[in-house]
Amino acid sequence: MKHNLRIVALALLPLLLMSGTAMAAETPELELTLKEAVERALAVSFPVKKASLERDKALLEKQEASEKLRDFYVTFSPEVEEAHILAAQAEINYHIKSKLEEAEKRDFTTTVVEKYINVLIAQEKAAAAGKSLSLTQYQHDAAQISFSHGMISLSALQKAKNNLEEAEDVLSSAQQELNKAYTDFNILVGLGAESRPNLVSEIPYIPLDINNITAEINRALDTSPDLWAAERFISLKRLDLLRYFVPSYDVAELELELAELDARGMREEIKRKLLLLIDEILSVEKAVAAAEVQVKKAEEALKEAVKLQSAGLLTKGEVLQLEVALDSARAALDELQYRHAILMTAYRNLTGREILPPSLTEAADDGLD
């Protein structure tokens, strides 16, 4: 009986494999825009969920503190005064937690954008490495033919083999980096490590346009949810000094001083981070301009080479070499522009703007209003 079942299973195996292949072919490939990726990530983020729960907890504490005030008659007593202060502190704490939740969401969104773009960068590198390998393979095959006809030396053939092995290693490394980039991204958006979603958003390159750095610094300070929360924490600590039943007045004074120092330090850190970020963005923009020149030169060189090949003055291998050079130049430019987009995302976050531009396909909209 077992033998018969085995025969039946073996007979059905090709059909099962074909069915599985057909099902895989019919399974639609997951496509994700940047906006969709952010929405998925926020929905499964533990840090965001924790911040939300802390906000909810603070809301309950605020409501309970307000309820306790109803238990007191409208007369003055240390207990009544204490209850009013605790209610005020609970109110402040709720708003602090709300702002910290906002900060967590903004920071997490910035991270998702970075991981999304990192996948695009890794894809570019893997594609460029693949094209380079194709050229190296062509050169290796040509070297083998030349060697078999006694046209090149054994050392020249060995060099071609070494170049091929090196190109294979570069491609393997690029594929590993792509796998790592996908793994990092998939973790954020709640996908399995083996998933390879198609990231369909086009990331525009929009140079930074700043008219007044001081205004940008002030904007960053005025819109920072972390700084807002730190400054409200000072107010909360000041109320401790008014309490009748504060555990230690001296400790409360020190805690207030520490809160004030933290807020001042945060203000200076925001200024420092913004200035460094602006410098880095402008530096990348200079590199982008230089890379654009290299792409243009590579395009012109390839265009001229195609003409020479048509006239029989250049070989296919020489033209392929220029094609790979152009692909490499474009990949270098794309990577710089992607790096710039990551920095601009951090810039929008730091200055309180919408982290995602209203339209990712309209280069005219930079989100810096």
Feature annotation, model-predicted:
Residues 38-42, 80-91, 98, 191-257, ...:
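Amphipathic alpha-helical coiled-coil scaffold segments and their short linker/junction regions
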Residues 11-19:
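Bacterial N-terminal signal peptides
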Residues 112-115, 241-256, 273-280, 285, ...:
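Long, charged amphipathic alpha-helices with heptad-repeat/coiled-coil character
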Residues 276, 283, 289-295, 299-301, ...:
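Hydrophilic extracytoplasmic domains
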